[in-house]
Amino acid sequence: DSPHYGERWARHWLDVVRYADARDLIQLPAERDFREAWRYRDWVVSAFDRDLPYDQFLTRQLAGDLMQPADPDQIDAESLVATGMLAIADFVPGDVDKEQMIADYVNDEIDLLGRAFLGLTVACARCHDHKFDPITTDDYYALAGIFFSTRLVPGPVKGNTPLVRAPLLSRVEIASIEAVRQHDQGRLVELRREINTVAER
């Protein structure tokens, strides 16, 4: 019943997935956009507070952007935000070999997936069959194929790369908010008139 239950247990999960609001600029000299990272953190806290079933907790973090709501006019913002786990992977831009850079990024995602979801060091199989766990290089590259099919958009680096932002509200919700805003603006104009009338007396 404590409002801090989700915060306490989310801390453990966020440590496992290496959550951070900022990066060490000595290690990563390029600017990174972490302004929205809090959304993922808050989603994890909320998931623990709501006792979200574990299968849904994992599925939304891996493929939340592919989960379609029943109503096509709605947006499943919660599932979009949950994919933040993949966005906070260790991405170091600037490697002269672009293919190597992407392969390293995919390796980091596979390592995260293996450690967080399976409790295994799957990334070892990038170079050789795992010495202790039943993970072969074939298994590794089967997983890697899934992550290689993902288009990487790292966000703005020194203002040169466009950041793709996904809407978290549907058009209907945006229209509703805009209607309330316009109503409130009209009411504000009326109140200012009344204030001016009283002030002139």
Residue positions per predicted region:
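Short, structured secondary-structure elements
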Residues: D1-V172
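Long, non-membrane, amphipathic alpha-helices that form coiled-coils
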Residues: P167-R201
